[in-house]
């Protein structure tokens, strides 16, 4: 065999390797893009609520990821609970997923209590079980406080502190 045909074989082998490597990189990029969530899905994961517009004693309900979220600005006569209250400035809030932890019914709010009509479960104004079959307090959605805004779906230090206590 001549030197020229060995050089030609080496060149063809290196060319094939380079094309295969480039194709592999393009394939990896396409796989990553396919696995990443769509921007519309990412945007749907966050809900922002302006807490400065809330009135003490009045329940506000927003939707986050197709679930009802209860936001209650506590009045001075409501029991303060440092283990579960969300504190923003001088105000205290109950922020919880508005589903009974027994079977997932949506409780109503009356006389400073959340009452589940399905099986008689009662939660206090902080979302803790007072009576009935619910096995635990109402769940707290991940949140972050940004000034007077509550950002649902994003984990902040306030949420981490509450979850450590529960």
Predicted regions and their residues:
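N-terminal secretory signal peptides and thylakoid transit peptides that target proteins
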Residues: 1-19
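A generic helix-loop boundary/linker signal
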Residues: 1-2, 90, 117
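Extracellular/periplasmic metallocenter environments
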Residues: 99-139
């Amino acid at each position: 065999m001549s030197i020229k045909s060995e050089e030609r074989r080496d060149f063809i082998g290196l060319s094939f390797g380079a094309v295969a490597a480039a194709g592999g990189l393009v394939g990896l990029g396409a796989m990553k893009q396919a696995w990443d969530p769509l921007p519309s899905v990412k945007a749907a994961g966050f809900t922002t609520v302006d807490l400065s517009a809330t009135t003490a004693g009045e329940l506000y309900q927003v939707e986050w990821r197709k679930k009802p979220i209860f936001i209650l600005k506590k009045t001075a006569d409501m029991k303060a609970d440092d283990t579960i209250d969300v504190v923003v400035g001088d105000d205290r809030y109950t922020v919880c997923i508005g589903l009974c932890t027994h079977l997932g019914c949506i409780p109503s709010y009356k006389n400073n209590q959340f009452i589940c009509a399905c099986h008689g479960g009662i939660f206090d104004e902080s979302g803790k079980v007072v009576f009935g079959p619910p096995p635990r307090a109402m769940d707290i959605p991940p949140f972050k406080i940004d000034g007077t805004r509550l950002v649902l779906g994003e984990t902040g230090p306030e949420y981490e502190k509450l979850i450590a206590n529960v």
